[in-house]
Amino acid sequence: MTVIDIHTHAYTRKYLEILREQGGDYGLKIRPDGFEEIFKGETPVAFPQPGHFDYDIRIRQMDDTAIDMSIVSLTCPNVYWGGKKTSIMAAQESNNAMAEAQTAYPDRLRWFTSLPWEYPDAAIEELERSCAIGAVGVMVLANVAGRSLTDSFFAPIWQEIDRRKLPVLLHPTDPPGAIVMDMGEFDLSWAVGFMFDTTLAVTRMIFTGFFDQYPDLKLIASHGGATLPYLVGRFEKGDEVELPQRRKMQQKPTDYLRHIYYDCITYDQAALDYLISVVGAEQVMFGTDWPHQVFDTQGAFNHTQALQAGTCRAIRSGNAQRVFEL
């Protein structure tokens, strides 16, 4: 059975050096175990692993776990730091490396472009350049340096993505307020803050009518949609009592939840089963979060294997083949 991993990450050594030298609030610190980790202030953001940098390691891991294709993306903190010149440079460094990796392994790798979202003209230029060298989608964090993705400032970028009908992987990062809420303790930013970040971003998109504005947008909500599936009843009740004068959606909240896509990274069989019951199996794709410490390749295989055969095939590859036109 073909397997396509749509949620897997990469860095380059040069990207980390740019971050180290020009990262602003972001930087690298030594952990108690002696390894380097990316922090924002005192809040852990990401822990680079050897597999983030080495595509030979990646291909061996894919071979060992029977993954046929990976669609790779830059992860947190992406390129929303350092000013315009630095943001563009970091995006191009990451995107060029992924394009080169795809050239080296054309049957095994595809990639999401990262864009300097804080500078829309530059972001659109990089989007055009990235698509020309092989990008099959766009990676965006759930907030751009604290700014909502529905901010009209980003409209030119969304219009171009929508025009191109590109899949967008919406991935969480440290949410606004993470420092005030002391989410650095016990890695609460990852465990809870990331889920809040995704949930708030997509909920705002739903209630502002964002998906009506961009009807061809193929959005993928990371980590099984965070808490979105669990809140479906609350969304419906909120819509029921909303004043008609303030309502911006053209459909019901559940309709939008069934319009967007999700990966299967839930770490729990019952959570995946519930996600499918809410949004439908045709909206869910295979993901592992490799090579982060919290990757769950075995869980992704086990949880999809437990589903009906047709559902398993759709999630492991069929849906991704349709969404990414592979």
Give the residues covered by each predicted segment.
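Mid-to-C-terminal alpha-helical segments outside catalytic/metal-binding sites
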Residues: M1-I6, Y11-M69, N96-A104, E125-R129, ...
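Hydrophobic faces of well-ordered beta-strands that scaffold small-molecule active sites
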Residues: I4-I6, S70-V72, R110-T113, V138-V140, ...
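Active-site environment of divalent metal-dependent phosphoester hydrolases
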Residues: Y11-R13, N78-Y80, E118-Y119, G146, ...
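Active-site gating loops and adjacent loop-to-helix segments of metal-dependent hydrolytic enzymes
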Residues: T12-H52, P176-F196, F235-L257
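Alpha-helical structural signal in soluble globular domains
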Residues: A97-A104, R129, I133, P156, ...
